[in-house]
Design a protein with these regions (language model features):
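Short glycine/proline- and acidic residue-enriched helix-loop micro-motifs
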Residues: 33-54
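Generic structural signal for well-ordered alpha-helical scaffold segments
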Residues: 56, 60-71
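Acidic, low-complexity terminal tails and accessory targeting/binding regions
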Residues: 15-26, 68-76, 91-151
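Hydrophobic packing residues within well-ordered alpha-helices of enzyme cores
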Residues: 1, 90-91
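Short glycine-rich phosphate-binding loop at a beta-alpha junction
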Residues: 5-8, 74-81
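Short beta-strand scaffold positions
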Residues: 57, 81-82
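Phosphate-coordination/substrate-recognition cap region in phosphate-metabolizing enzymes
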Residues: 1-33
Length: 151
């Protein structure tokens, strides 16, 4: 496929869940460390794992590399494929409109479309979230031209 470059970025790896890695919530339900972890917070990592703040910092590093490369190479469209937790944290941390991470949850094979300008990123470390991918259209009523011009 012409004009397609795939670059693996370690900054976009999934969150390190430490001692909770590869365990289900049911398996961890009576673990006091897990009970503490699910209370949330930016600086509340699982034992031997990574905090949300550390994940967001990694996301910033990745986005800075991606956006800088886009500007340098003159690219106007790129796709970033990564884990759902990173998608949610990237969009909540750097996306406009500002929303909670869970508001940016998506299923496998889904994601969001964002738009960024050099000045927006350089001045604000922000990008605009403009839609879902693939697009999800809400049911819209059918209108005729006459419907738009009647009182």
């Amino acid at each position: 496929q012409p004009n397609r470059l795939v670059a693996e970025m370690p900054e976009l790896r999934e969150m390190d869940f430490g001692k909770f890695e590869n365990k289900t919530a049911d398996e961890l339900m009576n673990d006091p460390d897990y009970e503490q972890f699910i209370k949330g917070g930016l600086d509340n990592p699982p034992p031997n794992g990574e905090s949300t703040r550390e994940v967001i910092n990694r996301c910033y590093e990745a986005l800075n590399i991606i956006i800088s490369d886009m500007m340098y190479e003159g690219l106007t469209n790129v796709a970033v494929c990564t884990h759902g937790g990173l998608i949610m944290n990237m969009l909540a941390g750097f996306g406009v409109p500002k929303r909670k991470p869970m508001d940016y949850a998506c299923d496998f094979g889904e994601g969001f479309e964002v738009m960024v300008t050099a000045s927006m990123w350089q001045r604000s470390n922000a990008f605009e979230v403009i839609g879902t991918y693939p697009p999800k259209y809400e049911e819209m009523p059918d209108y005729t031209v006459e419907d738009y011009y009647t009182d």
